[in-house]
């Protein structure tokens, strides 16, 4: 069942997936699940409070793990598994869709004109590729913050038989394919704290991270075959 879900949605079965969380909620708190009228992410909730509409963009919908990555419709198998009905979810719109006409209270609270346009956009990973110009199928974007990810934009869904990659629909015949890593910059922080000689840093009066970067720069690509699994 998991392989079929992944093949349909492009989202690996993982605790971070909203589909997985909804399934847990259904099993652990069935009464709460039964009382819920709608299920929303932060963005669709904000648009509801600002404009009175219940919508989100296709990329966020794809990230739920319940959107069929090929057809762009809600996946029947995923919905049946969670017990969620399509009408309980936000309407899926293009990321370039604009909302104009803020509710009076919202416009007043933000002190902006009610006709200020708001655009739905996309999830952060897709927009990071756009931001660095990695929107061609032969260009890869690597993002390293606290966590990390490698992503490429394609013109068709890419499904990995081993479920190592995610594949999210973005918009207008584009998909983002990649792999996440829960450790990125924090691994560098850990390495500096545990591997850099504190006395050397103190004696040289230099920043520990600068010292680490100097050492790293002297090591050839591939680090002589060293593998590190954070």
Regions found by a protein language model. Give the residues of each.
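Short beta-strand to alpha-helix junction loop
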Residues: 70, 95-102
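Active-site core segments that coordinate phosphate-bearing ligands/cofactors
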Residues: 2-10, 14, 20-55, 60, ...
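A conserved helix-loop-beta module that forms one wall/lid of the active-site cleft
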Residues: 83-94
């Amino acid at each position: 069942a998991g392989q079929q879900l992944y093949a349909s949605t492009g989202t690996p079965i993982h605790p971070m997936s909203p589909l997985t969380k909804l399934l847990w909620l259904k099993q652990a708190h069935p009464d709460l699940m039964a009382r819920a009228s709608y299920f929303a992410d932060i963005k669709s909730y904000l648009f509801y409070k600002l404009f009175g509409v219940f919508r989100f963009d296709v990329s966020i919908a794809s990230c739920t793990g319940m959107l069929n990555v090929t057809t762009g419709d809600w996946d029947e198998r995923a919905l049946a598994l969670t017990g969620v009905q399509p009408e309980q979810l936000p309407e899926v719109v293009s990321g370039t869709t604009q909302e104009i006409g803020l509710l009076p209270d919202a416009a007043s609270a933000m002190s902006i004109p009610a006709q200020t346009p708001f655009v739905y956009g996309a999830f952060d990973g897709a927009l990071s590729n756009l931001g660095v110009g990695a929107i061609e199928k032969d260009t890869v974007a690597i993002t390293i913050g606290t966590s990390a990810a490698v992503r490429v934009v394609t013109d068709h869904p890419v499904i990995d038989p081993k479920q190592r990659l995610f594949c999210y629909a973005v918009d207008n015949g584009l998909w983002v394919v990649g792999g996440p890593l829960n450790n990125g910059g924090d691994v560098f922080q850990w390495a500096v704290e545990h591997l850099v000689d504190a006395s050397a840093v103190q004696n040289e009066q230099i920043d520990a991270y600068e010292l680490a970067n100097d050492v790293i720069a002297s090591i050839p690509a591939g680090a002589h075959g060293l593998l590190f699994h954070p």
